[in-house]
A protein has these predicted regions:
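Active-site glycine-centered loops adjacent to acidic/histidine catalytic or metal-binding residues
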Residues: 51, 84-85, 124-125, 203, ...
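N-terminal secretory signal peptides and thylakoid transit peptides that target proteins
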Residues: 1-20
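Short, solvent-exposed aromatic-acidic interface loops
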Residues: 301-307
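Extended active-site neighborhood of metal-dependent phosphoesterases/phosphodiesterases
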Residues: 92-197, 219-235, 245, 249-301
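Residue-level marker for buried hydrophobic side chains located in beta-strands
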Residues: 46-48, 81-82, 121, 200, ...
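Short acidic, glycine-rich surface-loop motifs adjacent to enzyme active sites
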Residues: 192-209
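N-terminal active-site segment of His-dependent metallophosphoesterases
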Residues: 30-101, 153
Length: 307
């Protein structure tokens, strides 16, 4: 399990990269300062799922439903965060209307498993249909995804207990926040009371090691890092998916978690580089659980699944 305590972790080095637990079933974890949980009060338990890539093949719908039921039974989360790429793919040039409709209908059916839970989603790069008949078509682009995911906007925020949550849209030029969104984020962080613990979620990693292996990270990472440094009393953790790899990185007292993929190797068995069945490289299919404490500390643990 990964725990972050403000201003106490690796002050000299500044950066630590997670290591794989030898069992292969635990979190990809770093070695933080030990804390007595008896002195901390848990504010929220949050499930983070990402890169579901739901579709008809590989019996994926039933497997996904079983995993969601497992999460509910085992962890009893307060709510769910969905990191994007919810459907198999709508972005390829050869995708047609019926395929998009079918994928979203499967998503709708699966997500009824969580009908008693709030699900806060962000948009992934495979969710939007760019080859709709025209830009005026109701299913073109991000607006349709916003509608299907039942979210208020392509980027938005909300608060729970004493924590604030910011959901970003990195689906812009070179994987970045557009200027309108960045200015909104600046104001959003500025208006928060001092020391408000804040979690941010983007589909794409902002910082971490997975980008070194497979790319796919925010091109505006330095700009965002500087903004987070300005609000270092608030920004505690940044979640992502996209790369289907599990990685925890600490930098400047912020915990960056790329939390693998529910679909692993897109619900398939894998390839020559897969470390095990269903793995993408060394990461098995899975999901993450976060413990968010009243004092602003964070624990993020990645749980492989075998569904």
């Amino acid at each position: 399990m990964t725990t972050l305590k403000r201003r106490s972790l690796l002050k000299a080095a500044g950066l630590a990269v997670g290591a794989v637990a030898t069992s292969g079933l635990s979190a990809f974890a770093s070695n933080p300062e030990k804390q007595d949980k008896k002195t901390k009060k848990l504010a929220l338990s949050v499930a983070h799922i990402t890169d579901v890539h739901i579709g008809e093949g590989e019996n994926a719908p039933e497997r996904f439903k079983k995993c969601l039921k497992h999460i509910i039974t085992k962890h009893k989360p307060d709510f769910f965060l969905n990191g994007g790429d919810s459907i198999g793919d709508a972005s390829y040039d050869n995708v047609v209307y019926d395929q998009v409709i079918k994928q979203w209908s499967i998503w709708d059916d699966c997500i009824t498993t969580l009908d008693k839970y709030e699900v806060h989603s962000c948009i992934g790069n495979h969710d939007s249909w760019w080859k709709a008949p025209s830009k005026e078509h109701e299913m073109y682009g991000k607006d349709y995804v916003v509608k299907r995911l039942k979210i208020p906007n392509r980027y938005y925020s909300f608060s729970k207990k004493n924590w604030h949550f910011i959901v970003l849209d990195g689906n812009n030029a070179n994987i970045s926040l557009d200027q309108e969104q960045y200015e909104w984020l600046e104001k959003e962080l500025e208006k928060l009371p001092a020391s408000t613990p804040t979690l941010l979620m983007s589909h794409y990693p902002i910082l971490g090691t997975t980008q070194v292996l497979v790319g796919g990270g925010h091109s505006d990472c330095k700009k965002l890092k500087d903004l987070f440094q300005k609000h270092r009393d608030k920004v505690r953790v940044c979640l992502s998916g996209h790369n289907h790899l599990s990685d925890n990185t600490h930098y400047n007292d912020v915990l960056y978690c790329c939390n693998g993929a529910m679909s692993g190797f897109w619900w398939g068995i894998g390839d020559a580089e897969s470390a095990g069945p269903g793995y993408y490289l060394e990461t098995p299919p899975g999901y993450a659980m976060l413990n968010l404490y009243e004092d602003g500390t964070v624990e993020n643990e990645y749980f492989p699944h075998t569904y």
